[in-house]
Amino acid sequence: TADNMLNALFYFLLRNPQCLKRLEEEVSCVGATVNELSDDRLAKLPYLNACINETFRIAPAFNGGILQRVSCGATVDGVYVPPGVAVSVDHYTLGHDPQYWVKPDVFNPERWIDPDCKDNFKASRPFLIGARQCPGRQMAYQMFRVCVAKLVYLYTFEL
């Protein structure tokens, strides 16, 4: 999961050099040395977190969901789903659905920090939600923040 997400994130950053430049500028303001790039500081960087969230949305490492049983009947998109039926969500399709995202196929980290954005952020569930949420969620975010920030701080990337 981690290597796929790092590959995807740097792929999108390199395909969108303006995003990489903005991220480099944000990370460079955190500290004078690479050792100062702690997760406590990095967690407060809006653009770094937006890049990570946008990568989770547009290229989810885990596409399937955990099957859950419908507790009571419900009509979804005109189709009745009776009680007891197992359902799951396809994360890739959800992350690319124009019903939830403006320009869903465009890598746009700004959508995560723009207060006027019309996207439905509840449609991005890279770690699931509720009782079945991944227990390693916070650790994964910490690892991605530190790894991405240190790579961007130490190296120059280009295509």
From Swiss-Prot:
Effect of knocking it out?
A: Leads to the accumulation of the monomeric compounds fonsecin B and flavasperone.
Q: Name one GO biological process term.
A: biosynthetic process
InterPro entries xref list: Cyt_P450 (IPR001128), Cyt_P450_E_grp-I (IPR002401), Cyt_P450_sf (IPR036396), Cytochrome_P450_monoxygenase (IPR050121)
Cofactor(s) the record lists = heme
Alphabetized UniProt keyword annotations: Heme, Iron, Metal-binding, Monooxygenase, Oxidoreductase
Pathway, per Swiss-Prot/TrEMBL? Secondary metabolite biosynthesis
The protein's superkingdom reads: Eukaryota
- Does the record carry Oxidoreductase as a key word? yes
Q: Report the Gene3D superfamilies cross-referenced here.
A: Cytochrome P450 (1.10.630.10)
> In the UniProt record, does the keyword Magnesium occur?
no
What reaction is this protein's catalytic activity? 2 fonsecin B + NADPH + O2 + H(+) = aurasperone B + NADP(+) + 2 H2O; 2 rubrofusarin B + NADPH + O2 + H(+) = aurasperone A + NADP(+) + 2 H2O
Q: Name one GO molecular function term.
A: iron ion binding
Residues recorded as binding heme, renumbered to this chain, are: C134
Which EC number(s) does the record attach to this protein? Answer: 1.-.-.-
Protein task: Cytochrome P450 monooxygenase; part of the gene cluster that mediates the biosynthesis of aurasperone B, a dimeric gamma-naphthopyrone. The first step in the biosynthesis of aurasperone B is the production of gamma-naphthopyrone precursor YWA1 by the non-reducing polyketide synthase albA, via condensation of one acetyl-CoA starter unit with 6 malonyl-CoA units.
Q: Which family is this protein grouped under?
A: Belongs to the cytochrome P450 family.
User: Know the name of this protein?
Assistant: Cytochrome P450 monooxygenase aunB
